[in-house]
Each structure stands twice: as structure tokens, then as C-alpha cells.
Regions:
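Conserved N-terminal/central alpha/beta ligand/cofactor-binding core
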Residues: 3-7, 24-134, 166, 178-183
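Beta1/beta-strand and adjacent pyrophosphate-binding region of the FAD-binding site
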Residues: 4-18
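Short hydrophobic core segments
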Residues: 11-13, 169-179
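A ubiquitous, low-specificity "background" feature that marks scattered single residues
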Residues: 15, 27, 55, 139, ...
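N-terminal amphipathic, basic-rich helices that act as targeting or association modules
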Residues: 20-22
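Conserved beta-strand-loop-beta-strand element in the redox core of flavoprotein oxidoreductases
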Residues: 130-168
Length: 183
């Protein structure tokens, strides 16, 4: 099978909540971005807990919203019920929690991603992060010791791309790993 080689600025591995937000942020800044997922049907999947909000996650969602993130907007479009938590306590600890229609949440996020300029979605599993050595201030001193190579100084490397299990190579300047619980 021939090796496909494409070039992007940013590669995002994973399409859960964090991967979606990372890919959207990069693409909205004008970086050519590709997001890998093992299944396009599982983009922004909520397999267990369909809630967004609460005292901890709610704070994070508000921070994302302030930075232009999509999670808060998406839950606003797809929630089936919401509840204010900790109402018997002081206003500082009140927090909103919304329960999403799990399938609609996934479909809605998928639509947003598909309609974002500079963003490509690819169904593939990344097998390897590709790097290359870069000469540091002192170079990359190597010596042979008792039959094997040893570095005299730390070898500096930079990311140059990723390789999928099918052998396709995607060159890039940076990789964001957002594999969640599936690493």
C-alpha cells in the first residue's frame, strides 16, 4: 500500500471533549489542523455521564466559553434538562448542571467541526509520533561504549509528524494528544 503523505500545522489525536476543543481552537486561529479519531461516530461521545456542568466541570466549561470554546454552546443547544446545584448554600457555590441528549450532542459537535475552516477530520488510529534529531547548542555527541551507542549530551528532538497504523504519514509542526480514557 502506498504511503499517503499530507502536511498540517497541528495534529490532534482524539476527538473527545478535549480533542474537539483543541482542534477548534487551532483551526479558528488559522492553523491547518487535522483531528484523528478511531470512529467519526464517536466524536464528542458521552458514553456514560451525559451531564455538563456541576461545581468542577461547570467552572471548566465557563472558562472554555470565555476563551471561545464550543462545549458550553453545544450543551445549550442539546440539553434535555438542567438543574441548579447547591441552592441551599451560598451563591458562591451555586452551579448549573445540564443533561444532554447524548446522540444530539455528538451530532451537533460533529456538524460544528465539519463546518470549521482549516479543520480536517480523519478516521484513523495514530500508531507513532515521528521525531527528528536537532543539533543542540553542543551538538548531538554520540560515542560507542561496550558495543552500544551512548549519548554524551541529551539528544534534542522535535516532532515532525505522525504515522497511522495503515502507514499513512502526516507531517506537522505540533501534536496534541487528547486520547482521554482510551490511551
Amino acid at each position: 500500500m502506498p504511503v499517503v503523505e499530507e502536511t498540517y500545522d497541528i495534529v490532534v489525536v482524539g476527538a473527545g471533549h478535549a480533542g474537539c476543543e483543541a482542534a477548534l481552537a487551532a483551526a479558528r486561529l488559522g492553523f491547518e489542523t487535522i483531528m484523528f479519531t478511531v470512529s467519526v461516530d464517536s466524536i464528542a461521545l458521552m458514553p456514560c455521564n451525559p451531564n455538563v456542568g456541576g461545581s468542577s466541570k461547570g467552572h471548566l466549561v465557563r472558562e472554555l466559553d470565555a476563551l471561545g470554546g464550543e462545549m458550553g454552546k453545544n450543551i445549550d443547544k442539546t440539553f434535555i434538562q438542567s438543574k441548579m446545584l447547591n441552592e441551599s448554600k451560598g451563591p458562591a457555590v451555586h452551579s448549573l448542571r445540564a443533561q444532554a441528549d447524548k446522540q444530539e450532542y455528538t451530532r451537533s459537535m460533529h456538524r460544528v467541526l465539519e463546518n470549521t475552516d482549516h479543520l480536517t477530520i480523519r478516521q484513523a488510529e495514530v500508531a507513532e509520533i515521528l521525531t527528528e534529531e536537532i543539533p543542540g547548542e553542543y551538538g548531538t555527541f554520540q560515542e560507542e561504549h561496550e558495543g552500544h551507542q551512548e549519548s554524551g549530551y541529551p539528544v534534542k528532538k522535535r516532532i515532525v509528524g505522525v504515522k497511522t497504523y495503515s502507514g499513512a504519514v502526516y507531517k506537522c509542526r505540533a501534536v496534541v494528544l487528547a486520547t482521554g480514557v482510551y490511551l
